[in-house]
Each structure stands twice: as structure tokens, then as C-alpha cells.
Amino acid sequence: MGLVVVGAGGRMGQTLIRTIQSIEGAKLVGAIERSGSPFLGKDAGEVTGIGTLGVAITDDPLPVFAKAHGVLDFTSPAASVEFAGLAAQARIVHVIGTTGCSAEDDEKIRAAARHATIVKSGNMSLGVNLLSVLVQKAAEALGPEDFDIEILEMHHRHKVDAPSGTALLLGEAAARGRDIALADNSVRVRDGYTGPRETGTIGFATLRGGSVIGDHSVILADTGERVVLSHHAEDRSIFARGAIKAALWAHGKKPGLYSMLDVLGLNT
């Protein structure tokens, strides 16, 4: 499967380029960067430090998309919306690991999925997506009359959105387990005199610092006991492997908007 990496010069872009080389059935056929990037015109393999691959980095995505089978995208919300539209024009797979998308962004991506096969997830790791299933089951079994749910996440100092896409993914899983809407029952910030905790809400706490790739814990707390479900990312390659797995799974599927739960057969 011929894959294009967008944001090829970034941390995740370089990780994707390296990881593609080790996965059977996947081949790098294009690399995209923004206009004005210092990487334009350079070989994607040389930028990544793995030697010449014969793929030059460009800022003109549509001709590259037209010759590919899929796109791997961990960029920004605005860029991902644009790439979704181009993937729709090219009728190819678009795997989106970008976080921080607004409701309006998601609507535009959903519209593009009429013609592109899009897999979008707040986290591409296989472990996190299994964790989301466990969180949903735990939230359903341990009801709000007894157990409070708090979600704690920590990332490196350079992350620009909060709570993380993974924290929100886990929050949505907990909300499904409780049969409630996360948007109406989440507490994102606590400061000053807040009063007692409101029963049934799902709390979020965000930490930023150092080089932490991603730590997430879902805490279900009752009087006298706590259940903690956690995931710790130790290498960005887990996200790259998951994204490539998603692209290979989506190749040949009909256009639509899918998630990693679909890829893993966990969508019940």
C-alpha cells in the first residue's frame, strides 16, 4: 500500500517514515510539509536519518495523494481538515491522529468521509483503544451513586491542546458506560472554592512537563477503594504502528468515517 506522510519533518512524521520501512505491505510514496519548511526538496529518508528513500518532500499534496493509496496525518486541526478534503478528491484512505479538533472541524471531516475512507482516533495505540473498552465496561458496572470518575493525563511540555485527545477518548468511553453525554457532564477545570464534587460528573486533570510521551489513568473512586485503569506510552512508534495498521485495514473499505475500535474489531 502506497502511503503519504503529511507533516513529514515533525516528530510523528519522522517516526511514521521510519516505521513504514519495517511493516510488510506498506511503502512510503510521498512526504508533505508546509510551504516555507526547511525540509522542502530534501529526501524524506535523509531527513529522518535512515538514508535515501527516493521520496522528496513537497508542499503540493494533491498530485502526491492522487498517486497514493493512503495518507497518514498527525498534524493540526486546520491542516487535517484540508487534507481530508484532498483525500476525498483523490478517493483514498486518510488516517487522522490529529487531536484538538473542534465540532466544526469534525463536521468537515465527516463530510469528506462521503468520498474518502477516513479512520480518525484520539489515540492510534492498540493498548489505549483496548483500555477504552475496559473503561466503558467499568463505568457501566460501577455506577455513579458509588464511584466517581477522574481522568488524569500527562504529556511533554510542547503539547498544545488539553485535555489530550486520549483523555477525551477515555472520557467518551466512560460516558457511554454511564449512558450520559460527556459534554454535559465533564469538569475540565477546578480552581478556588468549588464546593463538593457533583455526583455523576467526569473530571479531568492535565499535567505538562519534560518529555513524557503520554500517561493516562482513569480513576474510579468509592469510599474505601479505588480502581485505576492506566496506559503509559514509552515510544511514539506505538502510534505510528497503529496508524499504519489502520491504513492497511481501511484499504479497500468503502468510504466512511471509522475509528480504531472498528480497526481492532472492538466496536460493539
Curated annotation (Swiss-Prot):
UniProt keywords, alphabetically: Amino-acid biosynthesis, Cytoplasm, Diaminopimelate biosynthesis, Lysine biosynthesis, NAD, NADP, Oxidoreductase
Positions in coiled-coil regions: none
Cellular component annotations (GO), alphabetically ordered: cytosol
Enzyme class: oxidoreductase
Annotated NADP(+) binding sites: 34
Positions that bind (S)-2,3,4,5-tetrahydrodipicolinate: 156, 165-166
Keyword Cytoplasm appears in the UniProt entry: yes
Compartments, record wording: Cytoplasm
Catalytic activity, reaction form: (S)-2,3,4,5-tetrahydrodipicolinate + NAD(+) + H2O = (2S,4S)-4-hydroxy-2,3,4,5-tetrahydrodipicolinate + NADH + H(+); (S)-2,3,4,5-tetrahydrodipicolinate + NADP(+) + H2O = (2S,4S)-4-hydroxy-2,3,4,5-tetrahydrodipicolinate + NADPH + H(+)
GO molecular function, one term: oxidoreductase activity, acting on CH or CH2 groups, NAD or NADP as acceptor
Active site: 155, 159
Main location: cytoplasm
This protein's pathway: Amino-acid biosynthesis; L-lysine biosynthesis via DAP pathway; (S)-tetrahydrodipicolinate from L-aspartate: step 4/4
Record carries keyword Transferase: no
Enzyme Commission no: 1.17.1.8
One biological process term in Gene Ontology: diaminopimelate biosynthetic process
UniProt-listed CDD domains: DHDPR_N
Superkingdom, natural source: Bacteria
Amino-acid positions noted as binding NAD(+) in the UniProt annotation, renumbered to this chain: 7-12, 33, 97-99, 121-124
Function per UniProt: Catalyzes the conversion of 4-hydroxy-tetrahydrodipicolinate (HTPA) to tetrahydrodipicolinate.
Family: Belongs to the DapB family.
Protein name: 4-hydroxy-tetrahydrodipicolinate reductase
Taxonomic source organism: Brucella melitensis biotype 1 (strain ATCC 23456 / CCUG 17765 / NCTC 10094 / 16M)
Gene giving rise to this polypeptide: dapB
